[in-house]
Amino acid sequence: MDFVSRPTTETAKALLGVKVIYEDEFQTYSGYIVETEAYLGFTDRAAHGFGGKQTPKVTSLYKRGGTIYGHVMHTHLLVNFVTQNEGVPEGVLIRAIEPLDGIEMMKHNRNKSGYELTNGPGKWTKAFNIPRAIDGATLNDCRLSIDTKHRKYPRDIVESARIGIPNKGDWTNKPLRYTVKGNPFVSHIRKSDCLNPDETWK
């Protein structure tokens, strides 16, 4: 997948339905991306690269598109795929996954089952047993990879405001969150809006 030559918002939409795979010593985990958020760097008041801020924790965000930027929030590991050329701190947060392979071990890792397994940015990374050390690695050159050939395509994509971003002016409500409409693994989805997962793909 091209992470560099198109707008980050387009990449965030294009990632919906892409298969994510993580392999540890014992297990292969996989699933389809159902929710993403775009973070637009220098001018995005909610982005870790806003204003060109550089600290050791955000070093990976300034690397070339296709780098994994992993950061911890409230003890949860959040995984972003960096976009754009080196030096431009933009990326896509992978917020939720519809699980495919390794579900029994995901239940063990999360001590949960059903939609709760992977319906949030810290939930799916724990389900997949992804370590913090993934930060800075290159997608598909490490244990975390994406498969754009064996993927799904959303029937409909919903654009909405990103989750948990108060007090950022215009950026609080910009529609930079992208979800597969009706997919029950999307975070914060109302039960009345949920469809059978299979009905949410073409």
UniProtKB/Swiss-Prot annotation:
UniProt entry tagged with the keyword Metal-binding: no
Metal-binding keyword on record: no
NCBIfam families associated with the record: 3mg (TIGR00567)
Alphabetically ordered keywords of this record: DNA damage, DNA repair, Hydrolase
EC number of this enzyme: 3.2.2.-
Lineage, uppermost ranks: Bacteria, Bacillati, Bacillota, Bacilli, Bacillales
Superkingdom classification of source: Bacteria
Protein's UniProt name: Putative 3-methyladenine DNA glycosylase
GO biological process terms held by the UniProt record: base-excision repair
UniProt record similarity statement: Belongs to the DNA glycosylase MPG family.
PANTHER family, A to Z: DNA-3-METHYLADENINE GLYCOSYLASE
Cross-referenced CDD domains: AAG (cd00540)
GO molecular function terms attached to this record: alkylbase DNA N-glycosylase activity; DNA binding
